[in-house]
Amino acid sequence: MGERFIKMHGLGNDFVVLDHLESPRELSPQEARFWADRRRGVGCDQVVQLLPGVEGGDAQMRIYNPDGSRAEMCGNAMRCVGLYLHEQRGMAAALAVETLAGIMRPQVTSALAITVDMGRPQWAGRAIPLDQDGEMIDAPLEVGGQSYRMTALSMGNPHGVVRVADAEGFELAKVGPLVEHHALFPNRINFEVVQVLSRSRIRMRVWERGAGITPACGTGACAAAVACMRQGWVERDCTVVLDGGELQIVWLESDRVMMSGPATEVFRGELVGLPAGF
């Protein structure tokens, strides 16, 4: 018997989902890299492992980047997991899913409308974390001989948001890895460039930590929207336009951030066998 998997995506941000709810086991960084490899494995932006909840949640979600490192949270993956647990596992439409960033609560209305309470943004430098105290709001960051004005925050994982005049023309493949590995960010960082289109609409592109450029990032969309909202550039209910589609982000007066968007199951399969050593 091989290893069964489900291929899903949220706005083109694709995942290999491993359902280990009934047979929990550890997933090594080497195995995660294999699953994510688009030539030798199945291929994905991130590997998502589902395990039994240990803190009262319906399930536990572990996220692995293509380089084998762990990610604290992924909004697009959370929508996919919510849809899978509800439609295929028969769980309630309102779920509690444990992550390294805490318990997240997806609410499934349909495959086109999954809303996730993403929690509260964290602005303190040590909470993101940054290698400095205090907040980083529209502050200069020197990268590759250029200066960018960055707002840093955590949405359960670290994000750096820079406003640009032209998101499409920004050299994200060049600047992204330099920002990710900047000395200011001890745990590395996800990097978003954002162009304000109107008071209710922004264009965002993302360089994900450990994954590179991806079509969409749920936590990144939340971070970009909230960074713009805090500085008064947009309203507190905003559409984020990503390479893969659109997400709706609302920053409530309670300080909680709500993300709404679709999730899609693409196919299911069975890996005949892992290479020796896994």
Swiss-Prot record:
NCBIfam families: DapF (TIGR00652)
Origin species: Magnetococcus marinus (strain ATCC BAA-1437 / JCM 17883 / MC-1)
Pfam families: DAP_epimerase (PF01678)
Subcellular localization, as worded in the UniProt entry: Cytoplasm
Site note Could be important to modulate the pK values of the two catalytic cysteine residues, residues: 159, 208
Subunit structure and binding partners: Homodimer.
This protein's name: Diaminopimelate epimerase
Gene Ontology MF term list: diaminopimelate epimerase activity
Similarity field: Belongs to the diaminopimelate epimerase family.
Main location (coarse class): cytoplasm
